[in-house]
Curated annotation (Swiss-Prot):
Subcellular localization, as worded in the UniProt entry: Secreted
Family note: Belongs to the glycosyl hydrolase 27 family.
Signal peptide location: 1-31
Protein's organism: Aspergillus niger
Protein name (record): Alpha-galactosidase A
PANTHER family found in the cross-reference section: ALPHA-GALACTOSIDASE A-RELATED, ALPHA-GALACTOSIDASE/ALPHA-N-ACETYLGALACTOSAMINIDASE
UniProt KW keywords: Disulfide bond, Glycoprotein, Glycosidase, Hydrolase, Lectin, Secreted, Signal
Amino acid sequence: MIQGLESIMNQGTKRILLAATLAATPWQVYGSIEQPSLLPTPPMGFNNWARFMCDLNETLFTETADTMAANGLRDAGYNRINLDDCWMAYQRSDNGSLQWNTTKFPHGLPWLAKYVKAKGFHFGIYEDSGNMTCGGYPGSYNHEEQDANTFASWGIDYLKLDGCNVYATQGRTLEEEYKQRYGHWHQVLSKMQHPLIFSESAPAYFAGTDNNTDWYTVMDWVPIYGELARHSTDILVYSGAGSAWDSIMNNYNYNTLLARYQRPGYFNDPDFLIPDHPGLTADEKRSHFALWASFSAPLIISAYIPALSKDEIAFLTNEALIAVNQDPLAQQATLASRDDTLDILTRSLANGDRLLTVLNKGNTTVTRDIPVQWLGLTETDCTYTAEDLWDGKTQKISDHIKIELASHATAVFRLSLPQGCSSVVPTGLVFNTASGNCLTAASNSSVAFQSCNGETSQIWQVTPSGVIRPVSQTTQCLAADGNLVKLQACDSTDSDGQKWTYPVTGNLKNAKTDGCLTEGSVQMKSCLYERDGQVFGLPSGVQLA
């Protein structure tokens, strides 16, 4: 568990996904056995850590299962009960097997697994890739096969593997050591008759540094090994000092940097939902849920379930938002626009609908008109039906939708696209994921990276052929000529200079120069491995090279 890592961006964010084509070859989907069917949509359920930390016992989990089965959470899709750290004895048994703490779990974990399964839940557990867990209990290093078999024999089908107490062995960097250990676990799980869902915490141990290269590198391999990855800081625990809202926003910002990795079978994990945290307002709790749902992020509640209010149960079981979260396309909502106050995000859904999510980060109520063109809807004379996913009310819109949001509130609309108006061009910010600066089009055909300001000049369309053009000047296209990057007429004969590809490393590569877009003075340079100035976020819907 990583706590206290500083927020890496106050303004930046990023992501991508799949639907149009910015490249020729789609990126292969992996799971812990190279099968996205193992976890095609993000997990939903309960974990004790953020609410109770090491104060866990058998009664907590039986009471949680009983309540979730009765209050609608299980039936809404929250079907996993997961233990976190501190469940085990301080010593392994004589044969090296892990043992549960018999005081905390007098009936044993196999008994508890049967109990929660009888209530309609899956059962998950926590371990660590080091020699000790974060809480000082036995880690799985050099016991991987034995522990995997133990967990399976207990009826467990989900493993959260933390990364405390991992040290580089001779001849390896720390990143290489983590890759070896998590890769070995992947091999162990792949050989099992019924592989466990594999939640990897490795990226969290590389987040929040001055140089993101190792963090990006770890993010490159976690989708190959498992189904979800805890990528950054821990969400603030119930008893922790500091602002719970700031903690949510910190993890939200981290998640926006990583959308290019997510697809069916692998999900970015910005950590638990904390709906009973006393430091959150009602709007902040609802925003936390709505943003995670829009991301198609794991919805794992860490709260005292029996004491949740009716209002908290109501938003946690919102069918329309859960349907977005569980949408089989598994796109992450990405930034269409951003300024100091509003984040506007969008994504596509499997049936062709378009999602609009708007977050008010400011401290006062905000009213704003949002053009449908910012959402990737470019056809004229169209009327769309927009459903408010909080209350189910619908409205007809044509060129814009009007939003009024209280401080720290989030609006979510699902737009139905009528026949003849159903084409979508991936649209949104192109921004550097280290600095958070947005690519900005100027009227003199120049481009620059500037602080994100919500202007149309920072919103870009990405066409199926790999052409990138600003919404403010749709007849102009981003082009490279030698080291120079500029806007030029889209009908230029220099077609290769206007074609870009986007690999999973986050580079924007130009077909003519074979170089990479580089922040700074905005120029083309040789492509370097996961260099901060060359890693960018693009709109959802752009397919990876």
